[in-house]
């Protein structure tokens, strides 16, 4: 996807001055720093790319707030088309980790922590493997794989399939392994986990708490794996900081819109939006946006 180029200047609240080298200016690179020798918050992407990412963050959060799921299914294909999958996944991870922290106390209180721990044991193997794929696979191959996985997961969600029966440790760990692999590679681990626990016979409050607590733990695994793999740098951090308010606004707006449509209607709308995002994110369509 070719987006309009132009300078983007990021000035952090504590920044004392803006440092722009001539070489960086020629490349459209801008860096904000609190001191001449301190670490830089750098954005090398064009202004159009960053605006597109912020829009994708709002759009994804709007759907999540509206339907309770789907943020990664929308954000990852779109953001990957703009800046690449190696940047898109860490950005969503950082934003989501920060904005869901407030949900943890209640989740810890009501979750079945033994089951969550069992699933996390599978994720501790799956997440690093997925992160390794994200770090080493060619970007174009990753984008095709992400779009294909999103469409497959969408078909899975539309089918309405649920695991029926009490969760068993070997199944729980296996789902954690698969979800961890998807999360490490593209932050797409939600559908397998939700499908498994939603049909497991637990109360809705417990299921929701299990999911929140599990993803808090798997997010830590992803963060460590991404950090060790060199996938979280100053540019990712800078864009995540910019995207966080848009994501928060989207969540609030989506929650507000929830009462204005029937369950069938809003699920249909969300499924359509996910499909559009997956198709729009395909490398085959990059030339259409140039």
Task: Label every model-predicted segment.
Residues 43, 132-140, 226-237, 286-290:
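Membrane-interface helix termini and inter-helical loops of multi-pass transporters
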Residues 49-118, 176, 180-183, 190-251:
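Small-residue-rich hydrophobic segments that form or flank transmembrane alpha-helices
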Residues 84, 138, 262-266:
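A helix-boundary/kink motif common to multi-pass secondary transporters
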Residues 100-108, 131, 136, 145-170, ...:
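Transmembrane helix exit motif
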Residues 114-122, 145-147, 167-176, 208-212, ...:
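Cytoplasmic-side transmembrane-helix entry/capping segments in multi-pass membrane proteins
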Residues 254-274:
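Interfacial loop-to-transmembrane junctions
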